[in-house]
Design a protein with these regions (language model features):
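A glycine- and small-aliphatic-rich helix-loop capping segment at beta-alpha/alpha-beta transitions
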Residues: 1-5, 55-58, 78-93, 153-157
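Active-site-proximal gating segment of KS-fold condensing enzymes and close homologs
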Residues: 1-36, 82-86
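Flexible, glycine/proline-enriched loop segments at strand-loop-helix junctions
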Residues: 7-14, 35-41, 104-110, 148-152
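Acidic, glycine-rich active-site loops and adjacent beta-strand->loop/helix elements
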Residues: 16, 40-44, 68-73, 138-143
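Active-site-proximal alpha-helical scaffold in enzymes
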Residues: 21-22, 26-29, 34-70, 108-130
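Short acidic, glycine/serine/threonine-rich loops at helix termini
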Residues: 49, 74-80, 146-151
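Phosphate/pyrophosphate-binding betaalpha-module
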Residues: 68-105
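Condensing-enzyme catalytic core mediating Claisen C-C bond formation in acyl metabolism
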Residues: 92-171, 175-178
Length: 180
């Protein structure tokens, strides 16, 4: 009864902690080494890739499975973003409502998905004859330090991230093939 406090399912804690998926993958495949969940909203997967890249170049691991997922399309997710007026109101034209880089944007479109990348130290990959799809040259991270939901009007945070990534990669802007 209530005199003993609320009753909890024995799986309450394991089901609520954010790194349970990473732990389950580790158990399923026998992966050892760094194992944790990155939590940084829309930047989580990119930050997870940056963490993996940094751990590999520091010699802390040879191979890391890195990625993320999102499943926010539920009453609390849609309701919360709607209450913040963060969602686009272009409901009459949903196929053109998403315009993240437009001056006339009026919010974002919710989505769900997930993905993983396997990052591997270059010489380790070459030694096993792996096909090399891409190389991470550098990473940059920064906060806008402007507003809870709006980007800085002059893009200062985005600019700083790109400058940090260029410096980290020791590259010039014209040498860049891809920006995430």
């Amino acid at each position: 009864g209530k005199e003993n406090g609320p009753k909890f399912n024995p799986f309450f804690i394991p089901k609520m902690i954010s790194d349970i998926a990473a732990g389950q993958i580790s158990i399923m495949y026998g992966f050892h080494g760094p194992n944790y969940a990155t939590c940084s909203a829309c930047a989580t997967s990119t930050n997870a890739i940056a963490d993996a890249f940094n751990l590999i170049r520091l010699g802390k691991a040879n191979v890391i499975v890195s990625g993320g997922s999102e499943a926010a399309i539920a009453a609390c997710g849609v309701g919360g973003f709607n209450a913040m007026h963060a969602l686009s109101t272009r409901n009459d034209s949903p196929e053109t409502a998403s315009r993240p880089f437009s001056a006339s944007r009026d919010g974002f479109i919710m989505g769900e998905g997930g993905g993983c990348l396997v990052l591997e130290e270059l010489e380790h990959a070459k030694a096993r004859g792996a096909k090399i799809y891409a190389e991470v040259a550098g990473v940059g991270r920064s906060a806008d330090a402007h507003h809870l939901t709006a980007s800085h009007p002059e893009g200062l945070g985005a600019k700083l991230v790109m400058l940090n990534a260029l410096e980290d990669a020791e590259m010039k802007p014209e040498e860049v093939d891809y920006i995430n």
